[in-house]
Amino acid sequence: MVNASGDPVIEAAHIWSDTLTVLKHSASLSPREKGWLEGVVPEGVFGSTIVLCVDNNDTLQAIQGDLNDSLLQALRTVTGENMFPAFKVVPKTEPEPLSAAKPAQPYPSEISPTVAEFGKESYGAKPVAAPREPMPATESQFPVGQQKMNRDPETHLNKNFTFDSFVPGDSNRFARTVALAVAEGSGQDFNPLCIYGGSGLGKTHLLNAIGNYALVKDPGLKVRYVTSEEFTNEFIDALQNPNQSQGQIAEFNRRYRQVDVLLIDDIQFLGGKEATLDQFFHTFNALHQANKRIVIASDVAPKNLKGFEARLISRFESGLTVDVKPPDLETRIAILRMIASMNGSKIPSDVLDLIAERFTENIRELEGALTRVTAVASLSNQPVTRALAEQTLQDFFTTDVEIKPTDIISQVAKYFHLTFEDLVGKSRTKNVAVPRQIAMYLAREMTSMSLMDIGQVFGGRDHTTVMHACTRISDRMQQKQEIYNYVMELTVRLKQSNTN
């Protein structure tokens, strides 16, 4: 099944072109599903693996999810044998939207997504209201101050993330204690250590702290921090050149199997990547048998990882699994004090208390709120006071004004260029389903209605459907900036429309 040219790039282009034709004529795929395939770019064929590039995680998840079986079948039809796709996420480089450069325009009316735009990769790069974006972009799971990423080129560790800058509390104290034991080399019984919890709760901070402390104890150690995406891309790169692939694979194996401490972040994103998981399995075994330290972080417990073979999950569970939870009030206040101290800012206690009381989900929320307050104070030449903080953050605080669910549906429909009937109707396409879930979430957050009553308003849906929608949007707000922006912008608009 090798193209006459012998060129893996040309071969991939031919295979993908034919595969795309097969998929486009498939009656089982919706136009929306076929649309996900348009932005896929073939990079090369290496044995039974075709490397495909996508420009964002939404496309990746769609293709690896609902489209996976259809894609495998189409590849089999075209090539006459089993061929497996390996994906690389290669973000597009796009110019900054003009609307983001106009802070004087607080509510750009023309940047709400149309039905055709909603969910497309090109739209995800645009914040809904750039001047009101509540949180700064950050690479860390547990940000402490507005510090630049200080990543070591060899170990990939962020030197700013240490145990000293990690604020302990009831929600994370056990995880920190175990992590410190692993870093000191006294936690042999905890190998591997698996840390899991929601986004923004400190997992990445702990991984980096382990590596940094281990090097302080023994500078001769070989330590490597890597995300699952980086591990995948390095493995795919090692396969790229057919003339040198054996040497590159050997180099890849040496790089990872000779480390003393391996720290791998966001392991859940390896799910379903069969070739990469097989490589990681052998890497894991080699390190574990050599008594090397392995620490992994995930958003779910090992037993709940999707797309992982039982043999790998059982190895994860053979060590110790610990979780990190959202911080309690005292810990949130302590975190804010740490952030302020590292920024060299003096923030009154009543301001820190206010922010800690109102922002409860994760550390990113806390830092974003504190950053917004200090920025407004600095730009307006005012001292940081509780009154200023309340005024600055009022858009994100709850209101005593009762908002009608029909107002929420109407506002969400208008925002996404849909109709009221679309949101209460039966359509399950993504460009309707996601706005509907957002509307249900807002109805739950901004009204006193029960889940059952909300379901009745949305076309007589079951209360479990509403519960699923609320959980889904709550989770995605932590994972995807654009979803967070949508909800915050709609919250502001609804509150304003009810106070006018």
UniProtKB/Swiss-Prot annotation:
Q: Does the keyword Isomerase apply?
A: no
The UniProt keywords, alphabetically, are:
ATP-binding, Cytoplasm, DNA replication, DNA-binding, Lipid-binding, Nucleotide-binding
Any one GO CC term of this protein is: cytoplasm
InterPro entries, per the entry: AAA+_ATPase, Chromosome_initiator_DnaA, Chromosome_initiator_DnaA-like, Chromosome_initiator_DnaA_CS, DnaA_C, DnaA_dom, P-loop_NTPase, Trp_repressor/repl_initiator
| Ranges for region Domain I, interacts with DnaA modulators | 1-81
Region (Domain III, AAA+ region) residue ranges read 156-377
Q: Where is this region: Domain IV, binds dsDNA?
A: 378-500
**One biological process term in Gene Ontology:** DNA replication initiation
Q: Which GO terms describe its molecular function?
A: ATP binding; ATP hydrolysis activity; DNA replication origin binding; lipid binding
Q: Where does ATP bind?
A: G200, G202, K203, T204
Mind telling me which Gene3D superfamilies this protein's record contains?
1.10.1750.10, 1.10.8.60, P-loop containing nucleotide triphosphate hydrolases
Span list, region Domain II? 81-155
Record keywords: Cytoplasm included? Answer: yes
Query: Where does the UniProt annotation locate this protein?
Result: Cytoplasm
Note the Pfam families from the entry.
Bac_DnaA, Bac_DnaA_C
- Classify the source by domain of life: Bacteria
| Main subcellular location | cytoplasm
Of which family is this protein a member? Belongs to the DnaA family.
Q: What does the UniProt record say this protein does?
A: Plays an essential role in the initiation and regulation of chromosomal replication. ATP-DnaA binds to the origin of replication (oriC) to initiate formation of the DNA replication initiation complex once per cell cycle. Binds the DnaA box (a 9 base pair repeat at the origin) and separates the double-stranded (ds)DNA. Forms a right-handed helical filament on oriC DNA; dsDNA binds to the exterior of the filament while single-stranded (ss)DNA is stabiized in the filament's interior.
Entry remark concerning the domains of this protein: Domain I is involved in oligomerization and binding regulators, domain II is flexibile and of varying length in different bacteria, domain III forms the AAA+ region, while domain IV binds dsDNA.
What quaternary structure, including any partners, is listed in this protein's UniProt entry? Answer: Oligomerizes as a right-handed, spiral filament on DNA at oriC.
Q: Mind telling me what this protein is named?
A: Chromosomal replication initiator protein DnaA
